[in-house]
Regions:
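Gram-negative outer-membrane beta-barrel transporters
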Residues: 666-785, 796-798, 807-812, 816-818
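Membrane-proximal, glycine/serine-rich, low-complexity loop/turn segments characteristic
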Residues: 2-4, 8-17, 21-38, 42-112, ...
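Flexible glycine-rich, low-complexity coil/linker segments exposed to the extracellular/periplasmic environment
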Residues: 185-232, 332-362, 408-453, 585-608, ...
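Extracellular/periplasmic, surface-exposed regions of secreted and cell-surface proteins
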Residues: 294-303, 308-313, 322, 329, ...
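Flexible glycine-/small-residue-rich
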Residues: 86, 100-104, 115, 137, ...
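Extracytoplasmic gating/loop element in the C-terminal half of outer-membrane beta-barrel translocons
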Residues: 339-344, 360, 809-901, 906
Length: 941
């Protein structure tokens, strides 16, 4: 668990120095927590008591508890102010979604990720190579990142070597993964009954299946004519295995130190029989290797150099033809066809083609492979200039990153078919003409470059740090240049920053920070590419005042506040185009002589160029308190308010359609957001027993103040005034009981005639009928929760310990859209057992959760409404670890080992939530999330 000096209340540590500063400031505070220096990257160390901005820190002790694929998955649920959510159960695609302080804008809310001072993708950064993760939240903390910092910054600092030492550390993890929520669908006989019930509800004269056929599905007597296939179990095995091995080498001499890491990962996926073909596998497996080298060199008394290198090779394998196996599983009923026929052909028929046979697709459609290659490099030289002026230094850094993705697809087709039944005679099915489709082919090959990214960064700075009696000062002048290019049209991006930052301290208790950043970007229009971002922040260490001396229970107490305006270059997708008139060229016919000629094109105006030359900007205010009380209780609280203005929005709502072309975008959007964050952490040791307990809770809220919304007939239709990502739909008030109930109710004009068992809606606008004008705001955001919290605790006795972290969300909504739950049976799709058990029938009218069955797309039922909406909040055990640290005295006898730890971990073992059928983080026709049991060993030589 988190150490009391390194854990959640690092979240309270507020950076008085930004991450790009290059100086160490020492504190003379008597209290260890307040005086502790924390490395936030690029050789920046700062004192907690000197900090004036809102930053939370996650240390390496916390990031190594999950045995996760990358650092992003390692910090799930951690870091005050950081929302992290899982979005996939497929190992190759496990990369969480992050937000800092919730939803803040209409055009983009993704934070900036920085690794060792350079913007970088974190999906290939392993937890073992990370020293700390800092979450920069307020204007003072993010100012020096210019246009890129408005949504907050996640700053990752990797490990470095140690002078005059040598250490080798090896970690081995073996994980067994299970699907957290394996979907359950009805069996073949139940499916046949459900289809017959749906046909009756739809008014069809004859059932879909005769009673003989329904009985045949249940008897199992005719497995090729009337099959009963569990497609989940036939396609996927019950578990997968992940192995992770890394070895790090830390050390150095008097003037050189190094940190090197080799990290290897392998996950073998869930496909059940992937090796039926010689020479290749169709499994959805994943292999990755990282090689990192961080070096520090003292070139002279006043000159130092740092070099960071990271190479990444990653490869993911999947079934061919871009087969979406889970989409097939969620669509195909168990009664469709057998996996294979008696003749050995793959199953398939005229109703359900063999190309949707998930077993055939997983084994006999070939395979695809993604190759990811990346190299990340940076070099920094720092020169102290005491001969010029004591405390003066200059620094330069260059960085170059290159990443590419190459996609190989080796696909093939296969023959599929099924026997048919012509009729039943004397209680036995009579065979008809067999159905055959598809064809057998060899592997075809195609190779393409899906993407590549190049990024170049250079910066140069001069900084000055000194103390004059009761006064201390640090000041920095810095220039940043960045170029990036991607595998796409008009993707080249240039950014520049010119920044000035000053930190002032008085009597080691009053602190003031000022920053001015002038940023430029080629994303913006000529004449408006540059903008100024000013910030100011201050802190007051009350615990050093004389009037606090007698309060022995107060070890450390500090108040702080910040305000700033952060400019951005955030634009809508392809936003650069909006600065120019948009034209289209099409064919045309015009009268010439005696006929019409069409062998020439015509060009017309398609969209008007914007006249908007403003920047989206974030005005941020933050106030907070940090404290250490009773010799071990660390506490932090932050409250914030932000206004985003000049957000680019479409002006289509302001102009009549008579304009005849697409309306321009203008910077008229305004969004307000506010909230608070609180952290507690308590550590204690009694004899040989150490224990700690802590918690974070964050609350966020947003409101759209302006977005150029088109006038609406009724106020319930207006989204302005509601939260960002607010859902709009109908309010369900039950089901129609019978025809008399329908006749007595207000007419529902939603595209289909209501019938018993259909959803009944509220007349929101009071006009006596239910139509599209009755939509209204329902639920909360479906993108990010408004409440996010965690609880962590741990206890250790003589090396034997237990750590656990729980994480939860609140005020969070979702909408069921999975085929087997939403529109089941429509288009011959399957139906989940949960829907079937909770469907409306005359007998279950009082307890039903879902509408009556239908084989047609019922427009009355299948729309966004509160019946399909669910409470997405959850409370999960993110990770638990039982470990044993071997006594050093025992290890000393080996004359080889310096440390050894044996552990067993559980990852995402259980969830308390409101969704019985799936997981609230990831639901729908996709890979379920995994639960993992991990056995591991860590040894240090």
């Amino acid at each position: 668990m988190k150490n009391n000096k390194n854990a959640v209340l690092m979240a309270m540590a507020l950076l008085s120095l930004p991450a790009s500063a290059q100086v160490k400031i020492d504190s003379i505070a008597p209290h260890r927590y307040a005086a502790q220096s924390i490395d936030v990257g690029a050789n920046v160390n700062f004192s907690r008591e000197q900090s004036t901005s809102a930053v939370s820190v996650i240390t390496s002790e916390s990031t190594n508890k999950r045995s996760a694929k990358n650092i992003g998955n390692s910090i799930l649920g951690q870091g005050s102010g950081l929302i992290s959510l899982q979005n996939s159960g497929n190992y190759a695609g496990i990369n969480p979604t992050f937000y800092i302080r919730g939803m803040q804008s209409l055009d983009g809310n993704t934070p900036l990720f920085v690794v060792d001072g350079i913007e970088r993708d974190i999906q290939y950064i392993s937890a073992e190579e990370v020293e700390s993760v800092s979450v920069l939240k307020d204007a003072a903390a993010t100012a020096l990142y210019g246009y890129k910092g408005a949504n907050g910054v996640v700053l990752i600092t990797t490990k470095r070597g140690k002078f005059n030492s040598k250490e080798i550390k090896v970690n081995l993890d073996h994980a067994i993964n299970f699907m957290a929520h394996k979907p359950k669908f009805v069996d073949a006989q139940t499916y046949a009954k459900a289809m017959n019930e749906a046909y009756a509800n739809d008014g069809f004269e004859n059932p879909r299946y005769t009673q003989e056929e329904v009985d045949a599905f249940g008897s199992g007597k005719y497995p090729y004519l009337y099959p009963n296939v569990n497609w989940v179990d036939e396609t996927f095995r019950n578990h997968s295995v992940t192995n992770m091995l890394n070895a790090s080498f830390t050390g150095g001499g008097e003037k050189f130190k190094y940190y090197a890491l080799l990290d290897l990962q392998y996950d073998n996926g869930f496909v059940k029989n992937p090796d039926t073909h010689e020479g290749y596998s169709t499994n959805n497996k994943y292999v990755k290797g990282n090689l990192r080298m961080n070096m520090d060199m003292i070139l002279s008394k006043n000159t130092t150099m740092k070099v960071n290198l990271l190479g990444v090779l990653a490869e993911s394998n999947a079934p061919g033809n871009s087969a979406s196996l889970w989409d097939m599983v969620y669509s195909l009923p168990s009664a469709a066809f057998a996996v294979k026929g008696e003749d050995g052909k793959w199953g398939g028929n005229s109703t359900w083609a063999g190309t949707v046979n998930p077993v055939a697709q997983s084994q006999d459609a070939g395979y695809s492979r993604n190759h990811n290659r990346g190299i990340y490099t940076d070099l920094t030289i720092r020169q102290e200039l005491p001969a010029v002026l004591k405390g003066l230094a200059v620094q330069g850094r260059i960085a170059y990153d290159h990443f590419s993705n190459i996609y190989e697809n080796y696909s093939k087709t296969y023959v599929y078919g099924s026997p048919t039944v012509a009729d039943w005679l004397n209680g036995e099915p009579q065979l008809g003409k067999a159905f055959t489709g598809g064809s057998e082919s060899d592997l075809g090959a195609s190779i393409s470059t899906n993407s590549f990214t190049r990024r170049f960064h250079a910066d140069a700075s001069a900084d000055y740090q000194n103390t004059f009696g009761a006064h201390s000062i640090y000041s920095q002048l810095k220039y940043d240049y960045e170029f990036s290019d991607e595998f796409a049209i008009n993707s080249t991006l240039y950014r520049q920053n010119i920044s000035w930052y000053t930190h002032y301290g008085l009597l080691d208790r009053y602190f003031l920070d000022l920053a001015l950043v002038e940023s430029g970007s080629n994303r913006l229009a000529p004449g408006s590419k540059w903008a100024l971002s000013p910030t100011v922040s201050a802190a007051w260490v009350l615990s050093k005042e004389n009037f606090m001396k007698n309060l022995n229970w107060v070890d450390f107490l500090k108040l702080r506040a910040s305000y700033g305006i952060i400019q951005t270059d955030i634009l809508p997708e392809s936003g650069w185009m909006y600065y120019m008139q948009q034209y289209q060229t099409t064919g045309g016919s015009y009268p010439f002589n005696s006929g019409f000629q069409s062998d020439f094109g015509r060009t017309y105006l398609d969209a008007i160029a914007t006249s908007c030359l403003t920047h989206e900007k974030a005005a941020k205010f933050n106030a907070g308190v940090d404290a250490t009380l009773f010799g071990g209780l660390d506490f932090s609280f932050d409250g914030f308010y932000q206004r985003r203005s000049n957000i680019w929005v479409s002006t289509a709502g302001k102009y009549s359609s008579e304009l005849g072309v697409d309306a321009p975008y203008e910077g008229d959007g305004i969004v307000d957001s506010w909230g608070w964050e609180a952290s507690l952490d308590y550590n204690k040791q009694i004899g040989d027993v150490k224990f700690n307990i802590g918690a974070n809770i964050d609350y966020y809220r947003s409101q759209i103040k302006e977005q150029d919304e088109a006038p609406k007939l009724y106020p319930n239709l207006v989204s302005t005034g509601h939260r960002v990502s607010q859902l709009f739909g109908y309010k369900a008030i039950g089901f129609f009981k019978d025809q008399a109930d329908i006749d007595a109710s207000k007419p529902q004009l939603l595209g289909s005639t209501p019938r018993p068992g259909d959803i009944k809606y509220e007349d929101v606008n009071g006009d006596g009928q239910i139509d599209t004008n009755d939509k209204t705001a329902i639920g909360y955001s479906t993108v990010a929760p408004e409440i996010y919290y965690n609880i962590h605790l741990g206890v250790e006795w003589k090396g034997l310990g237990v750590d656990a972290m729980f994480q939860g969300t609140g005020r969070y909504s979702g909408v069921l859209s999975t085929k087997s739950m939403y529109k089941p049976l429509v288009g011959n799709t399957t139906i989940s057992q949960y829907y079937y058990d909770n469907r409306w029938t005359p007998e279950t009218a009082g307890t039903a959760k879902f509408p009556a069955l239908s084989s047609t797309s019922n427009a009355n039922n299948y729309n966004t409404n509160t019946l399909w909406m669910f409470d997405r909040s959850f409370f999960k055990l993110r990770n638990i670890e039982v470990y044993y640290n071997f006594p050093k005295a025992m290890l000393a006898k080996t004359k080889l080992l310096n440390a050894a730890k044996l552990y067993v971990r559980g990852v995402d073992l259980f969830s308390f939530d409101h969704l019985d059928e799936s997981d609230p983080e990831v639901f729908g026709a996709t890979n379920p999330l995994n639960r993992s049991i991990v056995a591991g060993l860590s040894v240090t030589f």
